[in-house]
Amino acid sequence: MFTGIITDIGKVDRVKPLNEGVLLRIETAYDPETIELGASIACSGVCLTVVALPEKGSNARWFEVEAWEEALRLTTISSWQSGRKINLERSLKLGDEMGGHLVFGHVDGQAEIVERKDEGDAVRFTLRAPEELAPFIAQKGSVALDGTSLTVNGVNANEFDVLLIRHSLEVTTWGERKAGDKVNIEIDQLARYAARLAQYQK
């Protein structure tokens, strides 16, 4: 599990096609000595498993992960190319601060940025969610976008908006996001459970 608090901006170094998937090498500021094979790292919100690391004693800082058919179909990974910057977060450990909300790294689909608007020291992004996910997005609720835990400020049909302060723009890839871009979206699990419960109470 994750918290939606981004701890590094990684960069895609290489993309190697596999049978029904891809192998991604991600450059990172994380110390590879602190990463174990099999560890989970959220890459722009997608929970991926580390399958390779630099040799011990190497000054290189990267890790490799594999993404398969479902991830390529549901997420933005299918469009990733060498040089792309991505949000990174390592998995939650016992005792870690819970700064955002519980994020599982199981992306539900892609949302499209409709508008980016400066508002004083912050930036408001309006996004369009897939129709099937719209019922789970509520004002003042939580949503994970490219792995970032954000609060929904307003909702209008399948469009919603979020506000990011300048610091958040600087420590995530959101500073580069613009209208027309697509981002990974994971709806709040509590919203999913509430909807499921309501369905059975009808």
From Swiss-Prot:
Its EC number is 2.5.1.9. Is inhibited by riboflavin. Product inhibition may be the major mechanism by which RS regulates its enzymatic activity in vivo. 2,4-dihydroxypteridine 2 binds at residues 47-49, 66-68, 105-107, 140. 2,4-dihydroxypteridine 1 binds at residues 4-6, 149-151, 163-168. Lumazine-binding repeats lie at residues 1-101, 102-198. It catalyses: 2 6,7-dimethyl-8-(1-D-ribityl)lumazine + H(+) = 5-amino-6-(D-ribitylamino)uracil + riboflavin. Keywords: Repeat, Riboflavin biosynthesis, Transferase. One of its GO terms (molecular function) is riboflavin binding. It is an enzyme of class 2 (transferase). InterPro entries: ATP_synth_asu-like_sf (IPR023366), Lumazine-bd (IPR001783), Lumazine-bd_dom (IPR026017), Riboflavin_synthase-like_b-brl (IPR017938). Pathway: Cofactor biosynthesis; riboflavin biosynthesis; riboflavin from 2-hydroxy-3-oxobutyl phosphate and 5-amino-6-(D-ribitylamino)uracil: step 2/2. It holds the Pfam family Lum_binding. It comes from the Bacteria. Each monomer can bind two substrate molecules, yet there is only one active site for the whole trimeric enzyme, which is located at the interface between two neighboring chains and formed by the N-terminal barrel from chain A and the C-terminal barrel from chain B. Homotrimer. PANTHER family: RIBOFLAVIN SYNTHASE (PTHR21098:SF12), RIBOFLAVIN SYNTHASE ALPHA CHAIN (PTHR21098). Catalyzes the dismutation of two molecules of 6,7-dimethyl-8-ribityllumazine, resulting in the formation of riboflavin and 5-amino-6-(D-ribitylamino)uracil. This is Riboflavin synthase. It comes from Brucella abortus (strain 2308). The gene is ribE.
